[in-house]
């Protein structure tokens, strides 16, 4: 078996494409993570088939190989390769902190968002602040759900420039039962966002203000209420 693997690895650079493809198949059949490094040059191959197989190898063995293998993908010039690396950040677990922070600075929004999701496991305030202050709307939306996000930052997110971030922040505020004044809900009611959840929250925490709030409801709000009922 060891001889077969060594022979296959040496044939990955063979000039004959059929020989190279057989070598790739042999390596997969032996299912040995130690051969992963041999696939690294294939990430730059002109033939898309070899690039695809190299990515398959990293998906299979990248987590076992560790952060350095995932870093190989994240630092690649090819966008598809970097996105494949971003998909491995969450499976890396606690070993993925530094790489996930690095990936937040990638120029691609998809890589950034996948990095943000991987960072939710790290309950550190500085990580939460990196997310909530990010230029990418999707990253900020994810950051709203970070458990280490300070309450002041969460409240500030209620006034974020983007609707998705504001709505996500409101969802967390309502779920956590945080104290809010009635005026804070008005922009969301006007946009018909989280109408039912707002009414439930007010009924539970500020029942005296429920009449005032319901007086502001319009016919467009009633569909959300009726759907809930």
Give the ranges of each region predicted by the language model.
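Structural detector for internal amphipathic alpha-helices that build alpha-solenoid repeat scaffolds
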Residues: 1-2, 18-32, 37, 41, ...
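N-terminal leader/linker segments that initiate helical-solenoid repeat arrays
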Residues: 1-12, 17
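Short basic coil micro-motifs at the edges of alpha-helical modules that engage polyanionic partners
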Residues: 9-12, 74, 158, 214
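Short inter-helical turns and helix N-cap capping residues of alpha-solenoid HEAT/ARM repeat scaffolds
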Residues: 15-16, 46-48, 77-78, 107-108, ...
């Amino acid at each position: 078996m060891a001889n077969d693997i060594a022979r296959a690895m040496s044939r990955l650079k063979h000039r004959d494409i059929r020989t190279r493809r057989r070598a790739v198949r042999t390596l997969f059949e032996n299912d040995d993570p130690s051969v992963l490094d041999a696939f690294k040059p294939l990430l730059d191959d002109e033939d898309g088939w070899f690039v695809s197989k190299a990515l398959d190898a990293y998906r299979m063995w990248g987590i076992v190989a560790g952060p350095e293998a995932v870093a190989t993908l994240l630092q690649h010039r090819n966008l598809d390769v970097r996105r494949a690396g971003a998909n491995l950040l969450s499976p890396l677990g606690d070993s993925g902190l530094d790489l996930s922070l690095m990936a937040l600075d990638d120029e691609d929004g998809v890589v950034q968002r996948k990095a943000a999701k991987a960072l939710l496991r790290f309950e550190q305030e500085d990580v939460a602040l990196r997310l909530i202050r990010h230029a990418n709307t999707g990253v900020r939306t994810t950051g709203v759900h970070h458990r280490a996000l300070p309450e002041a930052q969460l409240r500030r997110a209620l006034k974020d420039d983007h609707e998705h971030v504001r709505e996500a922040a409101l969802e967390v505020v309502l779920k956590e039962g945080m104290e809010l004044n009635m005026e804070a809900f008005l922009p969301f009611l006007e946009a018909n966002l989280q109408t039912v959840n707002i009414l439930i929250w007010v009924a539970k925490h500020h029942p005296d203000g429920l009449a005032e709030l319901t007086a502001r409801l319009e016919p467009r709000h009633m569909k959300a209420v009726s759907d809930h009922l």
